[in-house]
Amino acid sequence: MTGSPRAPHQEHALGEPTVEGLARYIREKDVRRILVLVGAGASVAAGIPDFRSSDTGIYAKLGKYNLDDPTDAFSLTLLREKPEIFYSIARELNLWPGHFQPTAVHHFIRLLQDEGRLLRCCTQNIDGLEKAAGVSPELLVEAHGSFAAAACIECHTPFSIEQNYLEAMSGTVSRCSTCGGIVKPNVVFFGENLPDAFFDALHHDAPIAELVIIIGTSMQVHPFALLPCVVPKSIPRVLMNRERVGGLLFRFPDDPLDTIHDDAVAKEGRSSSSQSRSPSASARREEGGTEDGSSSPNEEVEDASTSSSSDGYGQYGDYYAHPDVCRDVFFRGDCQENVLKLAECLGLREALAKRMRFSGAAPATARKTSNET
């Protein structure tokens, strides 16, 4: 099965909520503004672990550090106190450029760019594989940063990423030559602001998107998870994942039409185990302030994008005001296989295979693909 079956007498924005129907919709509507949202599931086939898988995820392997919360490993507070923990994790992951190859998902995004159909690719991943696949920097938002550059966390002086890599691999914590502060790759820690490019995408790209394709993410990290909530309510939203995510954010064709969206349901959805990166309540030591207790410059952004926000779930109620049309579709399973199928239906399978052969890309089924980041 390539999609969710439709409820009786229910129309779908794609016409037919299948991979074939999605490809037909893209061709017939000549969709030119596709917003692609990418999570860790897209990179697991390259050999990079995700964060939340119960046995193989990064968080599952942090028990030896005796952390109160696994996300603390990626907080500035712990980095200042015990930088060796982050550097040990970074050394194990080895996400500095050149150590992993893009997967079919990454090359498919590049093909969307080449076809003139990519509005923007927003990725939660810090592995740089979208860039390695040739996605243009102008069309790429690395919302949580990457290992392509490094800087001091105190004075922000740039630091050689090559030196940072060599020192990390030798077991040394990189230090700033200007102020002696700790150096880290330019990845966004919990408690740090996301790049301006993310908010440009949130406020300017998402509202004009014609189609959203969400690949391999748990939809648990905010404000990234807000992106599907602010796209036009008339456009299709496609989820490619091993498991259903997003709670009440989505209504798929096989969902019951009589689902009640009331305050109790919304409250249940909002209380799910979400994480926020901009800034993070868990990373702050005093409520209402930043790490050092000062007022957060992005308090309004936080209020609108953390797990306590109702923005994403309130939109679900709009569907049931118009229950005759469904716009969401869920392609359950390996996101690599689903992307290969979509490429074939779009007539791009040969081009995708050529790109993968040329770049030495990771095989689409090299490893069981995770559903989240």
From Swiss-Prot:
Main location: nucleus
GO CC, one annotated term: cytoskeleton
Deacetylase sirtuin-type domain ranges (all copies): 12-349
Cross-referenced Pfam families: SIR2 (PF02146)
Coiled coil stretches, renumbered: none
Biological process annotations from GO: B cell activation; DNA repair; macrophage activation; rDNA heterochromatin formation; symbiont-mediated perturbation of host innate immune response
Residues that bind Zn(2+): C152, C155, C176, C179
Amino acid composition bias (Low complexity), ranges on this chain: 271-282
Cofactor binding note of this UniProt entry: Binds 1 zinc ion per subunit.
One MF annotation (Gene Ontology) recorded for this entry: tubulin deacetylase activity
Active site: H144 (proton acceptor)
Keywords of this entry: Metal-binding, NAD, Nucleus, Repressor, Transcription, Transcription regulation, Transferase, Zinc
Compartment list: Nucleus
Sequence positions that bind NAD(+): 39-59, 124-127, 216-218, 241-243, 335
Catalyzed reactions per annotation: N(6)-acetyl-L-lysyl-[protein] + NAD(+) + H2O = 2''-O-acetyl-ADP-D-ribose + nicotinamide + L-lysyl-[protein]
Cofactor(s) needed for function: Zn(2+)
Region feature Disordered, mapped onto this chain: 263-313
UniProt xrefs under InterPro entries: DHS-like_NAD/FAD-binding_dom, NAD-dep_sirtuin_deacylases, Sirtuin, Sirtuin_cat_small_dom_sf, Sirtuin_class_I, Ssirtuin_cat_dom
Signal peptide: none
EC number: 2.3.1.286
Family, as annotated: Belongs to the sirtuin family. Class I subfamily.
Function: NAD-dependent deacetylase, which probably acts as a regulator of gene expression believed to help form modified chromatin structures on the genes it regulates.
Protein name in the entry: NAD-dependent protein deacetylase SIR2rp1
Species of provenance: Leishmania major
